[in-house]
């Protein structure tokens, strides 16, 4: 799977787990709605660590927790 697909799947999964909307994440993280939408819709070509960190803060998790997923297991990303 490509990296942007893995990021999208994980973000959507976490939003579902937290019963949070993209708008709520925007208000909690400060990451623009368009950036969140781009990630969710796999329209991003690159997401920097600062954005991921801010999203994680909005979700109430660490970067480690974000990447603690089979989507990011060794050999899964073919980007």
Question: Regions from the language model: what does each represent?
Answer:
Residues 19-38:
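Short alpha-helical DNA-recognition segment
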Residues 13, 38, 67-79:
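Short, charged recognition helix plus adjacent turn
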Residues 1-20:
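A short, Lys/Arg-rich alpha-helix, primarily the initiator
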Residues 32, 43, 70-74:
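The DNA-recognition helices of helix-turn-helix-type DNA-binding domains
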Residues 43-54:
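Short, basic-rich loop-to-helix N-cap that marks the start of a DNA-contacting helix
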Residues 12, 23, 53:
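Residues within the helices of the helix-turn-helix
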Residues 15, 26, 56:
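The alpha-helix within a helix-turn-helix
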């Amino acid at each position: 799977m490509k990296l942007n697909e893995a990021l999208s799947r994980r973000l959507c999964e976490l939003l579902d787990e937290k019963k949070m909307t993209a708008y709520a994440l925007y208000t909690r993280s400060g990451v623009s709605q368009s950036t969140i939408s781009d990630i969710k819709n796999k329209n991003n070509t690159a997401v920097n660590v600062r954005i991921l960190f801010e999203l994680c803060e909005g979700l109430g998790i660490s970067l480690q927790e974000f990447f603690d997923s089979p989507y990011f297991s060794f050999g899964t990303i073919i980007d």
